[in-house]
């Protein structure tokens, strides 16, 4: 359950979305795009990191465990922060170019893009979960992530159901995103008792601004290009 909390939260979101016409399709199409970086980066890192951490912790290699965790976080953020910025800044062109054809009408593009942008805000959190969870699993602690997952699902359900009457179908996406950050925050807070092996090293702290700042500049450039190329992006021949 702890490892699949993202998928469970998405399922809850779809149940909430089922009360709104077309919302299930919009949620599904947006999910296709945001699951790509999550699957390629987050899940892959988690699979590689768990046995490495387990081996290092078993051998008492605290420094090596810290290095492995910090490099995993560094690599994850290096790839997912720019991806998240792109999903937030240019969701409309992405959806229009990839999906706008056949039964997917121009009127479907905007709500799908809205959901995609909201999911994009939570993408770093979803990926960081895959990096932080191995810290617990490597110590054979499955109860703590399970407890955090339950808390996260409560947050998701409360927000999705509570906000739906106020903001409509997008409440499902907001619930998923906020619950993702809630899960990540709990996992990070729980590592305080794990000692030096679970702390970010100086290299990660130095490189984090170098990841965020270029991603922000990229976002500004994408926004400007989208505005300049608005007519071209709307033409039929650029759709895949």
Description of each model-found segment:
Residues 1-240:
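Membrane-embedded alpha-helical bundles of multi-pass transporters/translocases
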């Amino acid at each position: 359950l702890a490892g699949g909390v993202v998928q469970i939260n998405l399922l809850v979101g779809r149940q909430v979305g089922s009360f709104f016409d077309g919302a299930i399709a919009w949620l599904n199409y947006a999910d296709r795009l945001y699951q790509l970086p999550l699957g390629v980066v987050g899940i892959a890192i988690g699979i590689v990191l768990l046995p490495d951490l387990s081996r290092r912790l078993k051998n008492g290699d605290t420094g090596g465990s810290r290095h492995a965790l910090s490099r995993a976080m560094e690599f994850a953020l290096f790839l997912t922060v720019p991806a998240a910025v792109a999903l937030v800044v240019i969701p409309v062109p992405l959806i229009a170019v990839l999906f706008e054809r056949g039964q997917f009408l121009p009127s479907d593009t905007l709500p799908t893009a809205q959901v995609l942008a909201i999911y994009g805000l939570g993408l770093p959190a979803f990926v960081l979960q895959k990096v932080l969870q191995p810290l617990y699993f490597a110590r054979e602690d499955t109860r703590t992530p399970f407890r955090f997952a339950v808390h996260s699902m409560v947050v998701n359900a409360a927000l999705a159901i509570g906000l739906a009457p106020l903001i409509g179908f997008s409440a499902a996406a907001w619930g998923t995103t906020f619950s993702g950050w809630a899960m990540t925050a709990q996992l990070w807070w729980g590592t305080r008792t794990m000692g030096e092996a679970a702390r970010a090293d100086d290299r990660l702290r130095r490189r984090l601004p170098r990841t965020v700042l270029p991603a922000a500049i990229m976002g500004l450039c994408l926004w400007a290009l989208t505005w300049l190329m608005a007519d071209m992006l709307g033409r039929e021949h650029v759709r895949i």
